[in-house]
């Protein structure tokens, strides 16, 4: 009888502790995010479009078809600059190309990016200070 009570008590204790050690406690949802950096081109006259490249992959060039080619790199013009959107990567450097209204290249440079990475256990978007391009 005492042995049965001890087994039952041990079983209840293990069952109670099992809730504290769930294998899903640190499970991350199956989501992704985009990293982005803003580029200020206000010091460079005549900029009408921006393209950027990470290694051999580039955002759409100005004047090109922008249908979905599967690229996760793109550029949006916003009030405070050009927002360069990447996939979940955070490259240390990117190539930035500036174009005039006739889609002629007026400046190309490689720019370093200093990212601040999320400390969330599941990751998250990285942030970077605005890149200010000089003429």
Which residues make up each language-model segment?
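C-terminal motif of bacterial Sec signal peptides marking the signal peptidase cleavage site
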Residues: 16-19
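Structural motif
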Residues: 40-45
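Bacterial signal peptide processing site
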Residues: 21-23
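Extracytosolic low-complexity repeat regions of secreted or lipid-anchored proteins
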Residues: 77-134
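Short coil/turn motif common to extracellular beta-sandwich-like domains
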Residues: 29-38
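Bacterial N-terminal signal peptides that target proteins for export
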Residues: 1-8
């Amino acid at each position: 009888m005492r042995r049965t009570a001890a087994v039952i008590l041990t079983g209840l204790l293990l069952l109670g502790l099992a809730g504290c050690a769930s294998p899903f406690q640190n499970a991350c949802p199956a989501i992704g995010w985009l990293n982005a950096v803003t580029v200020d081109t206000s010091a460079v006259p005549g900029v009408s479009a921006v393209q950027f490249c990470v290694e051999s992959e580039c955002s759409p060039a100005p004047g090109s078809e922008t249908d979905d080619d599967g690229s996760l790199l793109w550029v949006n013009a916003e009030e405070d600059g050009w927002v360069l959107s990447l996939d979940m990567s955070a490259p240390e450097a990117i190539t930035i190309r500036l174009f005039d209204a006739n889609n002629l290249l007026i400046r190309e440079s490689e720019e370093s990016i200093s990212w601040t990475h999320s400390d969330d256990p599941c990751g998250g978007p990285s942030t970077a200070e605005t890149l200010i391009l000089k003429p």
